[in-house]
Amino acid sequence: MKYVVVTGGVVSGLGKGVTASSIGVVLKACGLRVTSIKIDPYLNTDAGTISPFEHGEVFVLDDGGEVDLDLGNYERFLDVTLTRDNNITTGKIYQSVIDRERRGDYLGKTVQVIPHITDAIKDWITSVAVIPVDGRVGPADVCVIELGGTVGDIESMPFIEALRQLSYSVGQENFCLIHVSLVPVLGVVGEQKTKPTQHSVRELRALGLTPHLLACRSAQPLLDQTKEKLSQFCHVPAGNILSIHDVPNIWHVPLLLRYQDAHNAILKQLNLLSIAGPPDLQEWTKRAETFDNLTETVKVAMVGKYTGLSDSYLSVLKALLHACISCSLKPVIQWVAASDLEDEKAKEAPQVHAAAWETLKDSACILVPGGFGNRGTEGMILAAKFARENQVPYLGICLGMQISVIEFARSVLGLEKANSAEFDPDTPDPVVIFMPEGSRTHMGNTMRLGSRKTFFCDHNCITSKLYNNPDHVDERHRHRYEVNPDSVEALEAAGLKFMGKDETGRRMEILELPNHPFYVGVQFHPEFKSRPGRPSPLFTGFVLAASGRLKAYLS
């Protein structure tokens, strides 16, 4: 197994995930099989209980793993299906070691960070690296490992030490370290400053790891003199110092790496030049250029509660992008904080309230994504009502589906106090209820998670046609509340149709509103399986409806 390790320095948020994914893309384009591992040094065992404001969205895998959003980047870029074990956290490592200690596996020894924690990290990496993720038999050729955080963080020290030991045990020709750093330009001086990167590499070298390549993030391409200076002070050949400067879209990043011969530097270090071919990135080039040249736009109102951080809805944004490009449209995301639509906001901040409604009405379609808690839900209900009454294309995902059921029950059935038991436990009309198998005492890993089957009830519905009329679809889930089965009959009698259910027929998965251009709610999360070359059918239909092309597409 060959290992490519990506670390980061100076500041977080430099784009290590995109860089690691792009490295995987280029190596895969050279004919190699690639897998990925993300290391998160936090103590949580997984990302499931972390707020989107902390680390962005929680990405869900087929096996139900709740993981860091960078694994979503890996799946989209590399077109692979990862497992929960491809995300290593400090919590998982310590839990596994403590479990072994309680069983007596260490035979009376004092359990310490070195060697027990570091050995557990190495064992985890080497065992997960050989699990095939591309649908083929046998292990991959290269495992790309991204270490989260920045070099020098206390919590990442055991992982740095484990990677140092791994580099020694597997041998230099099986280990390539790429350090992502920042090269800022100070406004007054206007010079590309190398000192932050110098300090970061010095810190890395002090911990026993020497980078083979530097991936330098900057606004503009690195100057030759900047590369020479970095080479001199960081002991990295100038040819191995990569300029990862700002580009129009992230699909240019693999192309940047190819243009700078990053693949040859990596292949040379890993002794793979003899078996790898030149990278074939025609599809990536076409996609990047297509996006750059799009002129026709479509305005999408994103009505959510985490709108202050776009990474909270990263997979939704990517799924919209994939769908728009397949339809030759450029997405214009119009962020609407759900709470700004509520009547209370009109009293507190009338200008903010008016601006939110103006944005909503100016959009060609409305999307209400997933979320938890009752903040902003009344605003979402108002958005769903506006879409339903004004024939505006609407897509509700997870919470967004439940919102549309609540709105319909209130407005059409006349149940003014209809609500979700999540938002109002004492509601007389709970049209959304807690799952029978859910846990009320533990939050972590107790939801309905991962890939589940949804069976279609009517193949004439829009959703079934978009999926090409299969008997069922497999999509990923993440919820602990669902539509009340006892409310379904009344809702359907009033015109809201449930077109997809689970294998029991009791759990509602898809709803549609007939005689509406596109009014769809789904309990699952279609965004998690969208790929650049294979956009989610639901997002494609949503975008087509917004541009008035859905009817022609379906016929």
Where does each model-flagged region fall?
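Short low-complexity, flexible loop/linker segments enriched in glycine and/or proline
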Residues: 49-52, 228-229, 409-412, 514-516
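Active-site proximal loops enriched in glycine and acidic residues that flank catalytic Cys/His/Asp
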Residues: 8, 38, 218, 245, ...
